[in-house]
């Protein structure tokens, strides 16, 4: 047994690095077992070892050299596409094609591949004796054919460049000349015809931007709670899953890369990543639909409103059975939003078993340990045929088992629709934490391998979605599309009309903990909204939901009626409706809601719980340019994460305390960083380079009533408090006295117009 263990341990050996001009390779040696026939006659006849009975074969081992490129110039990375298979780096082509947009364009890669390495008849090829032989040309031709076949199959969207499709035309011209009649040529020709047809249909208005658009001539009818109650819960969950699955399967995985997704706020990129935007829009529409149906009209009785809440809880449970984590999270987020959760009388009328079910569903998205629960569920059930549900409530357990048994009896297999924000968060954090280039200006390809691990999960789940056997129910989809969605102001105002705030003029409202964040904000990657940490109690928010059409704004709560740049999901601060529900509020207060981008440990928790400002605020913070991290990180060192100091690095979040200061920026901090350097980098992230750095101070938020002012001469890594959230404020030094006065005026009450995230209720300060 000991010898066997030693053999396994030594089967792969790290051999070190090989450095060539323009490239660095990592080399490992792997022992590979080979089955051979025991007698010479069988070996001479070419009989394979696995075709012989036991006892007629012998096992032999050979050492296989695996060489994987760690970093290189663009030319070397493209050249490695041709040689990777010979180096036993079998995943390189897929990794490169999925991530190369982070350092090159399709045109650059195609020109290098075809003009430099694919020109088998040019003078360069004739001068190179090693490539001029027919055998060498055949090897290169086969390698290029395999690369192009994979490119056209896996990443066809790279060639969508209407109206002329220059890269696809160049590729097709090359294939007609070098590989006439080949499979890649047929694929390229079919793809060009498909793109051209779609382009014509789009110009003629025949191509809908949404898969679920209604015909214009259909008479619109206003939906409401009365009509909503006519749909069965399993039908609603199934239709939501159908819509989510269709949208998720259309997501272009490489658009989730942090280097691409973080650029969507630029004006020239307003149409960037439309498939991701469509998924976000569906999420936000569902949250607003939940809010609208629960609030309904003022005439609804408390019991009727409670039944609508109960129905949505049951629908969320059905989504859990269908493994639709996107709609599940949207429904939970909406029910936890301020406009709904403040309805104490309605929640008090919800049956206890449904409240316990709601608590269990909320716990799925707890941000404890970097959302470990939801991640484990996704890993466990991502490609499984059925959900695996355990409930502490006996009635819920019985109901769930009946539903699952019915699915098994009918032979129905379920796919999985993930919460995309988790992946978006992970990829954004990877992009922030890992450098794009290493010493010598070489492209850091180890970073791309890490990114591909996340991309591969997305692709795997997209394939799993094909297991769903569902069709559209036009009646429900039409009702869903026709919903009169309420803005934040409207939903909160209606909520207050339904149930007036208790003693709002005499006592300050009880602070609540943030539970979830709106989807579009979670997708903002490193641009994070303050108040997102579950351990901090925040002042009261006024509303949830909005009516935006795009998601280019990061304002926590857009307060204007014309949300031209705000596509926002639910805001979810919680207030315990009554004492029986206090346990629910506390146990699920760490819940959050968004897809994804999930790195290590608690690294992504920073992106999960931004809060919303009251709707009376008139300032929408702007998204600033992404700042690429160039701090040195090697593949042998744990990447820095938020709220955790790994060796000598960590990630902190810094906001600017001013009228627009409700946006966090992630910054990687090392043990060598002094306060002035950190302030300078934070100012650069927030586009404040024109201001003198000496006018600002760095303040760590300890709690709602305590701050830690970092001295100008301090080493921030060691001066900060590592036992609390790594949240900092960049504050002008001459504004401290004014803010102290402001605190004294607002400490007794929290008016509805108080801006969330401005820390105006902080009472004390700690200085070193």
UniProtKB/Swiss-Prot annotation:
InterPro entries: RA_dom, Ras-like_GEF, Ras-like_Gua-exchang_fac_N, Ras_G-nucl-exch_fac_CS, Ras_GEF_dom_sf, RASGEF_cat_dom, RASGEF_cat_dom_sf, RGL1_RA
UniProt feature, compositional bias: Low complexity: 541-561, 586-596
Region called Disordered, residue ranges: 530-623
Compositionally biased region (Polar residues): 597-621
Protein's UniProt keywords contain Oxidoreductase: no
Pfam families reported for this sequence: RA, RasGEF, RasGEF_N
GO molecular function: guanyl-nucleotide exchange factor activity
Every N-terminal Ras-GEF domain range: 65-196
A single GO BP: small GTPase-mediated signal transduction
Cited function: Probable guanine nucleotide exchange factor.
Complex formation: Interacts with Ras.
Protein name: Ral guanine nucleotide dissociation stimulator-like 1
Organism name: Mus musculus
């Amino acid at each position: 047994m000991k010898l066997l263990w030693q053999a396994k341990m030594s089967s792969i050996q790290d051999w070190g690095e090989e450095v060539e001009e323009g490239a660095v390779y990592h080399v490992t040696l792997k022992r590979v077992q080979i089955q051979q026939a025991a007698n010479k006659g069988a070996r001479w006849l070419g009989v394979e070892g696995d075709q012989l009975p036991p006892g007629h074969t012998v096992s032999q081992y050979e050492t296989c050299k695996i060489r994987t490129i760690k970093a290189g110039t663009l030319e070397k990375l493209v050249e490695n596409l041709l040689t990777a298979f010979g180096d036993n780096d079998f995943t390189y082509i897929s990794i490169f094609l999925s991530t190369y947009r982070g350092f090159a364009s399709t045109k650059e890669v195609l020109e290098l591949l075809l003009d430099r390495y694919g020109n088998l008849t040019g003078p360069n090829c004739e001068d190179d004796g090693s490539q001029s032989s027919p055998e060498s040309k055949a090897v290169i031709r086969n390698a290029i054919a395999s690369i192009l076949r994979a490119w056209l199959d896996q990443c066809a969207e790279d060639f969508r460049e209407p109206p002329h499709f220059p890269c696809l035309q160049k590729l097709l011209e090359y294939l007609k000349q070098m590989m006439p009649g080949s499979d890649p040529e047929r694929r390229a020709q079919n793809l060009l015809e498909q793109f051209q047809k779609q382009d014509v249909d789009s110009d003629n208005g025949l191509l809908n931007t949404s898969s679920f658009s209604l015909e214009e001539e259909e008479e619109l009818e206003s939906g409401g709670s009365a009509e909503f109650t006519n749909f069965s819960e399993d039908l609603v969950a199934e239709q939501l899953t159908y819509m989510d699955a269709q949208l998720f399967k259309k997501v272009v995985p490489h658009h989730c890369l942090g280097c691409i997704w973080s650029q969507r706020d630029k004006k020239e990129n307003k149409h960037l990543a439309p498939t991701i935007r469509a998924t976000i829009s569906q999420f936000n529409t569902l949250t607003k639909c939940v809010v609208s149906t629960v609030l309904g009209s003022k005439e609804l009785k408390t019991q009727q409103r409670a039944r609508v809440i109960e129905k949505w809880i049951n629908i969320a449970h059905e989504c859990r059975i269908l493994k639709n984590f996107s709609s599940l999270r949207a429904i939970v987020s909406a029910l936890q939003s301020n406009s709904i959760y403040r309805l104490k009388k309605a929640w008090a009328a919800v049956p206890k078993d449904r409240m316990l079910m709601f608590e269990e569903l909320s716990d799925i998205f707890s941000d404890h340990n970097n959302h470990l629960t939801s991640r484990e569920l996704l890993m466990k059930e991502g490609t499984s045929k059925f959900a695996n549900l355990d409930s502490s409530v006996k009635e819920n357990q019985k109901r769930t088992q009946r539903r699952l048994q019915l699915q098994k009896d009918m032979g129905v297999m379920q796919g999985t629709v993930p919460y995309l924000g988790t992946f978006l968060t992970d990829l954004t954090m990877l992009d922030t934490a890992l450098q794009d280039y290493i010493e010598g200006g070489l492209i850091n390809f180890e970073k791309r391998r890490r990114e591909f691990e996340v991309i591969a999960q997305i692709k795997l789940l997209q394939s799993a979605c094909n297991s769903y056997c569902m069709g559209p129910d036009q009646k429900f989809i039409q009702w869903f599309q026709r919903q009169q969605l309420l803005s934040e102001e409207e939903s909160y105002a209606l909520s207050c009309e339904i149930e007036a705030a208790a003693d709002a003029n005499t006592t300050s409202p009880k602070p609540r903990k943030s539970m979830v964040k709106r989807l579009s904000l979670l997708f903002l990657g490193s641009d994070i909204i303050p108040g997102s940490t579950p351990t901090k109690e925040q002042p009261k928010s006024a509303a949830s939901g909005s009516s935006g059409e795009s998601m280019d704004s990061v304002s926590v709560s857009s307060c204007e009626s014309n949300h031209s740049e705000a596509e926002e999901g639910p805001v979810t601060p919680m207030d315990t409706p009554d004492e029986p529900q206090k346990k629910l509020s506390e146990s699920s207060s760490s819940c959050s809601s968004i897809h994804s981008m999930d790195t290590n440990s608690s690294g992504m928790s920073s992106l999960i719980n931004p809060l919303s400002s009251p709707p009376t605020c008139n300032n929408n913070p702007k998204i600033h340019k992404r700042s690429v991290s160039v701090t040195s990180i090697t593949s042998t060192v744990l990447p820095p994460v938020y709220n955790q100091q790994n060796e000598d690095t960590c990630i902190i979040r810094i906001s600017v305390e001013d009228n627009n200061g409700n946006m966090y920026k992630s910054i990687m901090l090392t043990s060598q960083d002094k306060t002035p350097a950190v302030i300078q980098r934070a100012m650069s992230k927030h586009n404040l380079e024109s201001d003198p750095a000496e006018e600002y101070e760095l303040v760590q938020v300890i709690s709602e009533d305590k701050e830690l002012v970092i001295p100008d001469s301090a080493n921030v890594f060691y001066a900060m408090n590592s036992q609390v959230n790594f949240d900092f404020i960049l504050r002008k030094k001459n504004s401290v006295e004014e803010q102290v006065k402001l605190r004294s005026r607002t400490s007794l009450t929290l008016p509805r117009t108080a801006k969330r995230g401005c820390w105006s209720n902080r009472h004390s300060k700690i200085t070193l």
